[in-house]
Structure formats: C-alpha cells, structure tokens
From Swiss-Prot:
GO terms for molecular function: ATP binding; magnesium ion binding; methionine adenosyltransferase activity. It holds the Pfam family S-AdoMet_synt_N. HAMAP family: S_AdoMet_synth1 (MF_00086). It catalyses: L-methionine + ATP + H2O = S-adenosyl-L-methionine + phosphate + diphosphate. One of its GO terms (cellular component) is cytoplasm. This is S-adenosylmethionine synthase. The lineage of its organism: Bacteria, Bacillati, Actinomycetota, Actinomycetes, Bifidobacteriales. Residues 100-110 are annotated as: Flexible loop. PANTHER family: S-ADENOSYLMETHIONINE SYNTHETASE (PTHR11964). Its EC number is 2.5.1.6. Its cofactor is Mg(2+); K(+). Pathway: Amino-acid biosynthesis; S-adenosyl-L-methionine biosynthesis; S-adenosyl-L-methionine from L-methionine: step 1/1. Its main location: cytoplasm.
Amino acid sequence: MAELKLISAESVTEGHPDKVCDQISDAILDDMLAQDPHSHVAVETCATVGQFFVFGEVTSEGYSDIQNIVRSVVRNIGYTSSRVGLDADSCGVTVSLTEQSPEINQGVARLSGEEESKASREQRYEAQGAGDQGVMFGYACDETDVLMPLPIHLAHRLAYRLAEVRKSGEVPHLRPDGKTQVTIEYDDDDHPVRLDTVLVSTQHDPEVDQAWLKEQLTEHVIRPVLDDVLADRVAHDEYRVLVNPTGSFILGGPAADAGLTGRKIIVDTYGGAAHHGGGAFSGKDPSKVDRSAAYAARWVAKNIVAAGLAHKVEVQVAYAIGVADPVSINVETYGTEIGVTREQIQQAVRKVFDLRPAAIIDELDLKRPIYSKTAAYGHFGREDADFTWEATNKVDELKEAIKA
C-alpha cells in the first residue's frame, strides 16, 4: 500500500505573542502613513511578561503616540486584565526609534519632493531603487476559490473563527492566545482529497473542562468552517480532532512566551507550500521590497492561475539595493501549465507586470494605512478590497500577451 501524502499548515490567532507584535508594528506603520504617506518605517516590537519594547528606524513628517498605539492594539485583542496574563492599561512600553540610515535612503529616494512632483511617471519609477537586496516569492494554486493552498487557507479560517467565538461570547471562557493546524491528504497528482487532522489549541479560563471545550469548538468553530470551505470538494466525513493536546492552556500570550515581530513568516504566506526569501512584512513601509515585492509576486502568481495558464505557480523576484529593475524574475509552474509553455508565461509576465518598486507601490496603491488588517490571519487569500495584490485584474492582458 502506498504511503499517504499528508501536508500540514498552521495558523495562529491575533492573541499569539508573535502576532501581537506584528499587529503593534503594523498599527504604528499605519498611523505614520495616515499622516505622511511617504513615511519610511521599519518598526520591530518585542513582548515579554508585562512589557513591550518598540524599536527601529523611522523617517516621517508625522508624529505617533507609540504608547497609546501599543495599549490600544493590546486592548482590542483582548488582553485587558492580569487575570488573562496581560493588562493593556498597566503593561510597560519602552520605545527606541531612530532615523533611517541616510545611506539606505539615498538609494530609495533619489528625487527631492520638488523634483518628484515635476518628474514623469517613468522618471519616478527609475529613480526609486529597492530598499534592500533580497529574494521574494509569490504563489498561487487552484486548490481553493481564493487560489491559496488548502491547508493554510483552512488553518487561517479556523483561527479567525476561534477569535470570533471568543469575542462574541458564543463559546465562553476563552482567552486570546490560540493556534490551529490542518493536515490534508493529497493524491499522486498533488490534488487534495481528504481532511486528515484538525488541531486547535486555545487559551482558556482555569475552570474549563477539556471535554466540554472540545465539544464546543467542534460545534462552533470546526464544523462550520469545514462545511463552508471544503463543501463537497474534499472528503471530511472522518477526521481526527485534537483540542489542547497537552491538557490545560491557561497561561498564554506574552506571559507564557516572548513575542517578536516577523517570527511567523510561513503563517503569513503559504504555510510552507512555497519558498520564502526570509524577509518579514509587518512594520515595514512599501519601499521595503521584503513586503511590496512579495505582495506583487503573489499578484503575478494569482493572475497566472486565474487566467487558466497553470494549475499552480511560484514567482521569484530578486532585487539589488538602490536598483529599480529586478535582478531576476522566474516563473515556476511545476509542469502544470495549461496549453502554453512555462517560457511563454514568463515572457508574458515580463510584458504585463512592471516590478520596479515605485511601479508596484503605484499599481497596488500601497502608501495607504491598510496594514493592520494584514497582520493576523494571513497576508494572502483574503477577500478585502484593500488587499489590492489579490486582484485578478491582469488576466486579460496576460492572455493577450500569450497570443502575441
């Protein structure tokens, strides 16, 4: 008997300590972009027992009340009492922000404000180099309606629902920290065929009975999400459910584990289905190609799959600091291209998509304060108008470029 091919992916809730830090960093970024869309921001957050440290580099015409932003984010997540391990109103907040290095800035902003206002679009695109070197990846596949890998999409939906039932009180006695994990069986053609395991770990009040909790989460979180996402496309009549496998989960959040911005990069992207260049997203303005180019690569990949040119695709793009044009662009279709060659798809991508940093920022409208909502439950596969990199607005152009 052939060995089963089982693929897993995890997600975490907004109360996970690393995600708390991501949300703080992106809330600070949004506040600065709201005041000055040209802000250059690279903000990291670290969390430990009752204490947050915010540090990094910022160049902006705006002023942000960092202390208030931190407390607001923590409060909205649900850490409002020492009873749950963290009190937004009494936790310590230490801030250490400096200006962006002028050597980095000179490669990103070669035009002064007056020069930029007079420059043509092409001049602006050529003048703005990448904020750093690096390799970024984007991915899409036809396993789900949102063209994401099924394991990570399902894990995100479960994590989001877990937070929903906590906040609404539909399932009482839950606390903010939590994680989900999904295992899917694939056939020899790499198609998902069966749900194997659902794992949910959630922080809770001390008096909670674990058997009761498993029943509640199965009824109010797991089954509704599975019925909505899987429907009839993947077998899910029999699967294993694990809830808090170690037993109790009372102490959570930063009181149990230190948190740090950028430490959930696989959760943020494709759950391990694609490569990752290593650069995190949260706290970085769009001049940082770690973020903007990864968003653009997803945009490219999603349009390729939406155009029916391949069943799955990974787009790699690389940059040199201070240089506008990508050093390289590569499209990998894993032999799943449909009626075209991989080379034809790659040539079409080069014709249709301008992947210079300033062009990406313009095309995807990335200088807006939209990033807080990206900081939990995934940056990709979200059906939200502000997630412009999820638009399939280049499908027709790709098809025409293939014909040319």
